[in-house]
């Protein structure tokens, strides 16, 4: 039973990463505009944006262009990118980076004040704007948070977790039921923007905050929203394998600087898997590491020659993580493992963040604009959050309809921690880098058992969506690898999913 009700004039934004806060800033541009941000954790903690190391990819040099950036994005996306969305991202990307710099994001600069740009895997040009080598996410978020706190129209509620999307009798989203400081609160609004991040916390090994576990995806699906491409989960190939949860990340930029992947025998093995070697797309590199580890040869990142003595100031986050485990990356190889890093799927939206339900928007990793395809290009995630977060904020702020009273005020079922930890292990085992029908079928049965015991809540629904779509896609493409269906179909076809009762109903549409 709700303890009190709030009626809010502007959009309510669930999540406080780069997409959510950019949406809030965009929604409050202009007189008398307001936005309410709900964050389950204090700002600057608990969101993947603040953990991002590589930077933001954009055509910021005279040797580059949005068209080249778009071509690289589409190539990495393995046939499933929406060209219109990619074109928009790459055209608006340079200004998005400049806007963040204007807010105070301290991007690395050259003597002429131009951006220092790095090369990363599957990019045809150096186009990644960085901060302090590997500190882009934290520095960008600090600047954005300062701007949010300085904007009178933005209200932030920390320790606030969404428990249900509120809908009227016509299905319109009219607000959110949230646990705010232990009280169940009915928040009515003209629009809700989901900016809840990805699904890393559904897996045992992830580079994202463990509390980012697909709840926004599940909330939207349980409300009846269309979900796109949930089977496509990106595994970053070089999480630092030191037994920490979440696993620290060894940024892609290290390989861009010339770091080499070796096995325990010291052999540089990437030439056996792809002509681009260490700079192959992430899905290729992740599968190569998985194969080396499965064969008992181990996998290590050797940056002793490429970075060496420069580690402490060029890649301080990686250096600190390694040293905390007794590994000196200036002289020793770094043990690495694939880890869940990003979800290409999400709530299906148009180019302004509109979901299939009136009143509902989504931006950032929890959305699927069609930009990322079956495999995200390195350093496109912060860019997508900034570009599409701003667009969603503007569109949601323009919503005029309020809808009727909500038909249900009951919180959706939660999942106890012990059950969640078991789910994480099962997801890594059967819906990980390598998948097959036997494992996915077994995993789906385990999810059904958990649903029978704990109810069909957002976390389990998010897991079910991933597994059901992975079982249905009988091919290998991008981040989805089926060892029982290793070939890639000639025509790329996206997945669209809606929940119909307990079972996801899948349909496909060629892009």
Swiss-Prot record:
Principal localisation: cytoplasm
UniProt-annotated binding residues for FAD: 16-19, 48-55, 365, 381-382
Reactions this protein catalyses: L-aspartate + O2 = iminosuccinate + H2O2
Root EC class: oxidoreductase
GO terms for biological process, alphabetical: 'de novo' NAD biosynthetic process from L-aspartate
Position of the signal peptide: none
GO MF annotation: an example: L-aspartate oxidase activity
Keyword Isomerase listed: no
Site (Important in orienting the L-aspartate substrate) location in chain: 120
Cofactor(s), by name: FAD
EC numbers, comma separated: 1.4.3.16
Record's keyword terms, sorted: Cytoplasm, FAD, Flavoprotein, Nucleotide-binding, Oxidoreductase, Pyridine nucleotide biosynthesis
Pathway given in the UniProt record: Cofactor biosynthesis; NAD(+) biosynthesis; iminoaspartate from L-aspartate (oxidase route): step 1/1
Keyword Zinc attributed: no
GO CC field: cytoplasm
Cofactor note (record): Binds 1 FAD per subunit.
InterPro entries: FAD-dep_OxRdtase_2_FAD-bd (IPR003953), FAD/NAD-bd_sf (IPR036188), Fum_R/Succ_DH_flav-like_C_sf (IPR037099), Fum_Rdtase/Succ_DH_flav-like_C (IPR015939), NadB (IPR005288), Succ_DH/fumarate_Rdtase_cat_sf (IPR027477)
Catalytic-site annotation from UniProt: 282
Location relative to the cell: Cytoplasm
Pfam families named among the record's database cross-references: FAD_binding_2, Succ_DH_flav_C
Function: Catalyzes the oxidation of L-aspartate to iminoaspartate, the first step in the de novo biosynthesis of NAD(+).
Family in the record: Belongs to the FAD-dependent oxidoreductase 2 family. NadB subfamily.
Protein name: L-aspartate oxidase
Source organism per UniProt: Caulobacter vibrioides (strain ATCC 19089 / CIP 103742 / CB 15) (Caulobacter crescentus)
Gene from which the chain derives: nadB
